[in-house]
């Protein structure tokens, strides 16, 4: 009953409270309450609202850097967004993760990916189940070496290491994410099992044939070309090694001449710091072009609906106005000088993208979990 009432009255209540006048009292109360609650002992060790930073970007530069980010994008023949200068793709990705890393941990958790919500499992547990499948796909055993391509703050790598016994090395272009990954390693007791490294995954600082296996989880979508990152993975894998990846791609239902489809995809591109969106077929071909043998190509989002779809939690955030609350909290904290002055723009960018992300999933024109499993020939 409570949920039903909230679903009926919640959005309207949020609308009325989040007017210019109503926002003042709401923001003040929420911030004060949040400060009190998050100072209580036993709270989870993730960034709190007033702990949010801009990664490696100085507070006074946030607005300027965001404006540069905005100007990085141009439009193609059908109005589709893309990064105009491909030489700046990695700079863009690094800037994006400076902006959003703390916010992601605060609002979503330390697993920067999507997963289906499984029956009886929490959001975090469902995320870890999604991660642990990688160990099975790659046939990992204790003592093997594995590469996490685009590791973020490292939760997938830690999960794979913990459930397989393999030693996982992660690579991310963002130095601030390395700091967070090392912190989580100490917190979880996985120092030595997950080793985060800063670097460009299209030009990795690893010797050829260094790893028994490799995986990427919602990460290679940041590469200028998939062949660039797949080629590097091919180089550092030992012959016979497996590479599994969850790819962000357009599905067979995406129509580049459909203006609504393009608008949804543009929002996903801009709100996630992507250079563009590839199709599932382009992802398959990219792996084969660099020498891999394609073993599996399957969109996990189309699996039998045992649980909730991958966009279930974002859909709830939209439905119950949680994104509006987050935007109001951040805007209020900025106006009070508690957060970088222009960081509300970053929050709005991500929050405004979420409804389009949900629509992309619900209409099956986009998936963040097209599974590809490749093998390097012996």
Curated annotation (Swiss-Prot):
Transmembrane segments annotated in the record for this chain: 17-37
UniProt keywords, alphabetically: Endoplasmic reticulum, Lipid biosynthesis, Lipid metabolism, Membrane, Methyltransferase, Microsome, S-adenosyl-L-methionine, Transferase, Transmembrane, Transmembrane helix
GO biological process: methylation; steroid biosynthetic process
Chief subcellular location: membrane
Keyword Disulfide bond tagged: no
Source taxon at top rank: Eukaryota
Pfam hit, one: Methyltransf_11
SUPFAM superfamilies recorded: S-adenosyl-L-methionine-dependent methyltransferases (SSF53335)
Name listed for the protein in its UniProt record: Squalene methyltransferase 2
């Amino acid at each position: 009953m409570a949920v039903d009432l909230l679903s009926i009255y919640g959005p309207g209540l949020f609308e009325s409270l989040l007017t210019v006048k109503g926002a003042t009292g709401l923001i003040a109360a929420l911030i004060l309450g949040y400060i009190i609650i998050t100072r209580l002992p036993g709270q989870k060790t993730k960034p709190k609202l007033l702990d949010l930073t801009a990664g490696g970007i100085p507070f006074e530069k946030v607005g300027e850097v965001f404006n540069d980010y905005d100007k990085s994008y141009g439009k193609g023949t059908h109005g589709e967004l893309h990064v105009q200068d491909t030489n700046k793709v990695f700079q863009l990705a690094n800037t994006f993760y400076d902006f959003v890393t703390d916010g992601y941990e605060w609002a979503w958790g330390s697993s920067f990916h999507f997963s289906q919500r499984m029956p009886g499992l929490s959001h975090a547990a469902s995320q870890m189940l999604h991660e642990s499948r990688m160990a099975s796909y790659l046939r990992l055993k204790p003592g093997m070496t594995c590469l996490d391509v685009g590791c973020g703050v490292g939760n997938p790598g830690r999960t794979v290491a913990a459930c397989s016994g393999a030693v996982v090395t992660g690579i991310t272009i963002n130095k601030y994410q390395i700091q967070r990954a090392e912190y989580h390693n100490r917190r979880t007791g996985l120092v030595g099992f997950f080793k985060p490294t800063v670097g460009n995954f299209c030009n990795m600082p690893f010797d050829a044939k260094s790893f028994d296996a490799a995986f990427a989880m919602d990460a290679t979508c940041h590469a200028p070309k998939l062949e660039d990152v797949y080629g590097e993975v091919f180089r550092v894998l030992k012959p016979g090694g497996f590479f599994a990846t969850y790819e962000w791609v357009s599905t067979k239902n995406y129509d580049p001449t459909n203006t609504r489809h393009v608008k949804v995809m543009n929002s996903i591109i801009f709100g996630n710091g992507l250079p563009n969106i590839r199709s599932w077929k382009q992802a398959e071909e990219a792996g084969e072009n660099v020498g891999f043998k394609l073993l599996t190509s399957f969109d996990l989002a189309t699996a039998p609906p045992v649980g909730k779809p991958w966009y279930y939690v974002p859909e709830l955030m939209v439905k119950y106005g949680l994104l509006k609350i987050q935007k109001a909290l951040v805007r209020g904290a900025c106006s009070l000088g508690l957060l970088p002055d222009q960081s509300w723009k970053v929050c709005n960018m991500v929050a405004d993208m979420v409804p389009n992300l949900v629509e992309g999933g619900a209409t099956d024109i986009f998936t963040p979990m097209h599974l590809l499993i490749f093998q390097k020939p012996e």
